[in-house]
Amino acid sequence: PFTINGEVDFSDLERTAVNLKMHAENYELLNAPRTKRAMVYGKMYVDFNATLRGPVEELVMRGNMNILGKTNVTYVLKDSPLTVNDLLGDIVTFVNFNDTTSVEESSVQQISLGGMDVAMTMHIDQAVQARVDLVPDGSNYMLLEGGGDLSFQYTPQGDMLLTGRYSLMSGEMKYQIPIIPLKTFNIQNGSYVELSLIHI
């Protein structure tokens, strides 16, 4: 079960404050069947511990979430403007580290949660299986098995930051390249993605 314990202080209605503890073990966060309209389906299980304190206009949240190994989820890319020719354009970027030309950083529209301060750590078990269907019928996909430790931060100024390392034990990608039939690419054990102050 997901439990919330604590206090909500209404003594000053202009500055309502909370002091809450949230806890869940082996909690089924997602249980969604595959349907034509589903963007995410599968099952996700988590352990979750967090505190939420302060006036409602300036809430401070601290905690951690463990995504358990029996998790198996799929994300479906839908209504994507990508064509067959550039299907991987925004998913995989090949980098030449010898190229010293600078690339202008694209501007990202920030979403404000009203001064909330959030810092969460997230542990992903190595047995977690995650899949991305690159096309709705699932014929082109990425299947990843692995885990890691990530940190998420949301600042009162509206910045969302993600850091950490996601290590892969195995995986594969099936992708149909124009003129070339469906091809399978295997992901080697030991591959990883390093995230360093990624703005979301």
Which role does the model predict for each range below?
Residues 1-198:
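Strand-loop-strand
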